[in-house]
Curated annotation (Swiss-Prot):
Species of origin: Helicobacter hepaticus (strain ATCC 51449 / 3B1)
Record pathway: Amino-acid biosynthesis; L-histidine biosynthesis; L-histidine from 5-phospho-alpha-D-ribose 1-diphosphate: step 2/9; Amino-acid biosynthesis; L-histidine biosynthesis; L-histidine from 5-phospho-alpha-D-ribose 1-diphosphate: step 3/9
Protein name: Histidine biosynthesis bifunctional protein HisIE
GO biological process, one term: L-histidine biosynthetic process
PANTHER family (UniProt xref): HISTIDINE BIOSYNTHESIS BIFUNCTIONAL PROTEIN, HISTIDINE BIOSYNTHESIS BIFUNCTIONAL PROTEIN HIS7
CDD domains noted in UniProt: NTP-PPase_HisIE_like
Region annotated Phosphoribosyl-AMP cyclohydrolase, chain positions: 1-130
Length: 231
């Protein structure tokens, strides 16, 4: 597969569009971008690595969620400027919990009614991105000077320190709810979300995995869900 790497004109192309297809089902899973370094990692490890344009860094697919992609074959197009990764997908490819990122279908047949463009999604994309971005910022703060970063100092305190703050923030939210103070409720809830994310980062658990657990519970009564924990 190293021949693929050498055929790309990296001086001309900084990023190569990379289509990801599941080997067994032949389903298109996602579209990502490969840089010279990410493709090199992909070819060396046989695990899919990509370059994130939003975060400006290389990331391994499934590095936090565990939904990794084992590369079985790489295809290069006739112009040497786009790739296809043929993979074995562990879990799902899409952060919404769908198997593929391409789960919205719009028919060109006039006799078929298209779903509305603003169709509801499993997770509101904007909200998810805020949680995901904040989580990765927290991860980046881990190695900073604890005298200059509150997040770094909190992570340095470990589970006891973080747990104490989560309990404290949850209590403040409860008081705001009791006082029916809408502004305070929103403010304290944001504080609680942040400290929960710090706790998740301590254990390297992404918000995606929590959202997947919430999705699993959808359509199931709370009584049934609690009863299932006893087995």
């Amino acid at each position: 597969m190293q021949d693929v790497f050498r055929q790309i004109d990296w001086e001309r192309y900084e990023l190569i569009p990379t289509i990801v297809q599941e080997k067994q089902s032949q389903q298109i899973l996602m579209l990502a971008y490969s840089s010279k370094q990410s493709l090199e990692l992909s070819l060396q490890t046989h695990l899919a690595h990509y370059f994130s344009r939003s975060k400006q860094r290389i990331w391994q697919k499934g590095e936090q969620s565990g939904h990794i992609q084992h590369i079985k074959e790489v295809k290069l197009d006739c112009d040497n400027d786009s790739l296809i990764f043929i993979v074995e997908q562990v879990g799902v490819a899409c952060h919404t919990g769908e198997k593929s990122c391409f789960f919205r279908i719009f028919s060109l047949d006039k006799n078929c009614q298209n779903p509305p463009v603003s169709m509801p999604q499993k997770y509101p994309i904007g909200v998810y991105h805020i949680l995901d971005d904040l989580y990765h910022i927290i991860e980046q703060r881990r190695c900073e000077n604890i005298e200059h970063s509150y997040t770094a100092s909190l992570l340095a305190k470990g589970v006891n320190g973080i747990g104490k703050k989560i309990i404290e923030e949850a209590g403040e939210l409860c008081f705001a709810l009791k006082d029916k103070d809408e502004k305070a409720i929103i403010y304290e809830c944001a504080d609680l979300f942040y400290h929960i994310l710090v706790g998740l980062a301590l254990e390297h658990i992404t918000p995606e995995r929590v959202l997947q657990e919430l999705r699993r519970r959808m359509g199931q009564s709370g009584i049934e869900e609690k009863a299932s924990r006893k087995h």
